[in-house]
Amino acid sequence: MTAHEVNFDGLVGLTHHYAGLSFGNEASTRHRFQVSNPRLAVKQGLLKMKALADAGFPQAVIPPHERPFIPALRQLGFTGSDEQILDKVARQAPRWLSSVSSASPMWVANAATVCPSADALDGKVHLTVANLNNKFHRALEAPVTEALLRAIFRDESQFSVHSALPQVALLGDEGAANHNRLGGEYGSAGVQLFVYGREEENEIRPARYPARQSREASEAVARLNQVNPQQVIFAQQNPEVIDQGVFHNDVIAVSNRQVLFCHEAAFARQKVLINQLRTRVDGFMAIEVPAGEVSVSDAVAPYLFNSQLLSRDDGSMLLVLPRECQDHAGVWRYLNKLVAEDNPISAMQVFDLRESMANGGGPACLRLRVVLTEEERRAVNPAVMMNDALFTALNAWADRYYRDRLTAADLADPLLLREGREALDVLTRLLDLGSVYPFQQTGAADG
């Protein structure tokens, strides 16, 4: 059956700021306390979406979350009106204010893991929400992510959205950032590669930074998504690269159809994995970047592998890269050599995503890939699909509500909270989502 990959990109939230919340993500740590520009951030993301949509790659949007997230502060024991809580936490525990104000939901590669209908035992598209429990600011996301996905993939005859796994370390799940699908045509059955960093009773794990994904979680997600057991491979990421800042697999590898583009040090027992894939995937091609040409640190710094690999109508592939790759002499030299060689990657497109990149999220972090047949695509909420009208409307919306300068101190401003809620209220109407945010369901009561 004919199917296409649709990229659902996250909209950057109104409280996008640099707080260094993500230990193990070196870009996040390096840019802590810099002044951010939320309006520029959301527009950089929109420009990427629109350019790719105009080039024939189907695009859609996933909205940001409510931030600052007052219910989480109430859970932590702060009381009073919303405004009083903001004032208290800013004075007593500013780190918590930064955490509940994180715009990290924009990196929707961590929103869920997706199984196309061609791979599912019941013939439906499955999405399992990620619990993201390694980081407090990200562990807040799952309930609203689930509500948003249900509002977008609302036809239960075509889609099954599953709640996140229990919030325990044993079941740490980071979503599609640790998942690859390989195969031929999108509409044909493929092989799903689940990548984990640790498993219980296995001492092979990183020493410096946490391994966020467990094998136990990956296996549970595969079951929830009803992936045909004959179409699954579980592989461990090389713990040594996790300790060099590769906190998700999409920082060291990217796949599309029959191609796996990765660093030669990406996986533990990489030769065994490559041979497995070669046996299971017709026409499989591994493009392994040698450390002698690009070191792991040189690949991580400009996010070489946090790129998008997209199929064009003629069968060739386009590599979508952050501008930082072009600015890195060694990486850019390697890439120009790559596209000149005999392989499916024949073109590159560079985007300025500086605001997201400084927090540790490149092109691949910003998108959730969903393979859909034409019938399934018609069943998606049409209001989220990117086109000229939506691009214009979202830019006008951003101009109205987003600030062009934000510091950690600004997060305590009650006006920022009100601006955000008003903006999301307008956005849910624009995207026909219904009442998906807690403040909409409670009337934003001060109690």
From Swiss-Prot:
The active site is at 174, 248, 365 (nucleophile). Pathway: Amino-acid degradation; L-arginine degradation via AST pathway; L-glutamate and succinate from L-arginine: step 2/5. The keyword Hydrolase applies. Substrate binds at residues 19-28, 110, 137-138, 212, 250, 359. Pfam families: AstB. It is an enzyme of class 3 (hydrolase). Belongs to the succinylarginine dihydrolase family. PANTHER family: N-SUCCINYLARGININE DIHYDROLASE (PTHR30420:SF2). This is N-succinylarginine dihydrolase. It comes from Salmonella paratyphi A (strain AKU_12601).
